[in-house]
Swiss-Prot record:
GO terms for MF: S-adenosylmethionine-dependent methyltransferase activity
One Pfam short name: RLMM_N
Keyword Methyltransferase annotated: yes
A biological process from GO: methylation
Enzyme Commission number(s) of this protein: 2.1.1.186
Family: Belongs to the class I-like SAM-binding methyltransferase superfamily. RNA methyltransferase RlmE family. RlmM subfamily.
Protein name according to UniProt: Ribosomal RNA large subunit methyltransferase M
Active site positions: K305
Highest taxon listed in the record's lineage: Bacteria
Binding site for S-adenosyl-L-methionine: S187, C220, P221, G222, G223, D239, D259, D276
Enzyme category, top tier: transferase
GO cellular component: cytoplasm
Enzymatic reactions: cytidine(2498) in 23S rRNA + S-adenosyl-L-methionine = 2'-O-methylcytidine(2498) in 23S rRNA + S-adenosyl-L-homocysteine + H(+)
């Protein structure tokens, strides 16, 4: 397949397009992007017949900032009748063999969501047809490719596949998280999603374990602190504003009425540093760099608020600067990742893990 379909947040198509254009070029893959504002998806159209296949295999989804999910695809199917959508869709997927799962999806827009009920019903006959053709296995398998059918309109769809080891495990790339009734603010879901996205599930018991020490810069009223507390951590909450009473009653939170940009930890026993302050992204990045150089944490998750224009360019520059500054200051082993998460709005979430191979004392 020559194209690559990418889901993103509505309004961020231009940023997603700029990113995939650059990343494809880095792999020596030429093409152009089709994107319309508020469609919540973009399509990279390659010049060679297998460009989409190459990107689906060689470009790590986790390395993309603005794409929630991606799959190799053909051209838009828009010539089938409402009476028989199954046949043309099944015929478009003949290149896919022995896939382990079928996902009939829509972009994340209010208009497209109106097709959700249809997609659920349509999945049953389509699954049966794909099994008969050998496109799908009789039983689901998490190790085989995933078939994607994305309806962008009632009679228009993109079809293709993603590889199970380079694909979001979530439908449409969106994790379904429930807002805790006792959480101080909805921002709590941002950190919850960040932990799910950046930390492999099998490592939660070590890297997110009870008893770790954490610092939350700009903590008020405690949305992010809540996620640390519910995992059993001891938290230093830094903010001049008031903290949620119930959080303080847990005995796990020490509230420091101080400026998050001026606070310094008394001891070097902080594992997690988190920060969701409303501030210029470059200034927050500089603060994180300073903490890293001082050796004041092991892992950090922080948000960068985005400008109105040139968002991909701005974030890319900040990440490149951070990478260079850490190296210049003797930190040669680290993992730096960035994602525009579902619960983020005009911001991105960054994860920084210092010296991953060195044990935490």
């Amino acid at each position: 397949m020559k194209n690559l379909f990418l889901y993103c947040r509505a309004g961020y198509e231009k940023d997603c397009a700029a990113e995939i254009q650059q990343r494809a070029a880095e792999l020596g893959i030429g093409g152009f992007v089709k994107a319309n504002r508020d469609d919540a998806y973009v399509v990279f159209q390659g010049f060679s017949p297998d460009d989409g296949d190459r990107l689906a295999k060689e470009l790590p989804l986790d390395s993309l900032i603005f794409a929630r999910q991606m799959f190799a695809c053909g051209d838009l199917l828009d010539d089938f009748s409402p009476e028989d959508r199954v046949t043309p869709i099944a015929e478009s997927l003949t290149e896919v063999e022995r896939a382990g799962e079928l996902r009939v999806e829509t972009p994340d827009t209010n208009e497209a969501k109106e097709l959700s009920a249809f997609c659920r019903k349509f999945t049953v006959p389509l699954r049966q047809a794909l099994k008969k053709r050998g496109v799908l296995l009789d039983k689901e398998s998490s190790r085989r490719p995933i078939v994607h059918v994305c309806f962008v309109a009632p009679n228009k769809a993109f079809t293709g596949y993603s590889l199970s080891n380079n694909s979001s495990p979530h439908f449409m790339g969106i994790p379904r998280l429930k807002f805790p009734a006792d959480a101080p603010s909805r921002s709590t879901l941002k950190l919850d999603e960040a932990f799910i996205h950046f930390i492999p599930r099998e490592e939660h018991e070590t890297r997110l374990r009870s008893g770790l020490n954490a610092v939350d810069l700009g903590a008020c009223p405690g949305g992010w602190t809540y996620q640390l507390v519910r995992r059993g951590m001891m938290v230093h909450a830094i903010d001049n504003g008031p903290m949620n009473h119930d959080l303080m009653e847990t005995g796990q939170v020490t509230h420091h009425r101080a400026d998050g940009f001026k606070f310094e930890p008394a001891r070097r026993n902080i594992y997690w540093l988190v920060c969701d302050m409303v501030e210029k992204p470059a200034r927050v990045a500089e603060l994180m760099e300073y903490w890293a150089i001082q050796g004041w944490f092991k892992e950090a998750i922080f948000n960068l608020k985005l400008p109105m224009k040139s968002r991909y360019k701005e974030v890319s520059q900040i990440l490149a600067n951070m990478h260079a500054i850490l190296k210049e200051n003797g930190i040669h082993e680290f993992h730096l990742a960035c994602k525009h998460l579902y619960h983020d709005r005009d911001e991105v979430t960054v994860h920084l893990w210092l010296r991953p191979s060195s044990p935490w004392i």
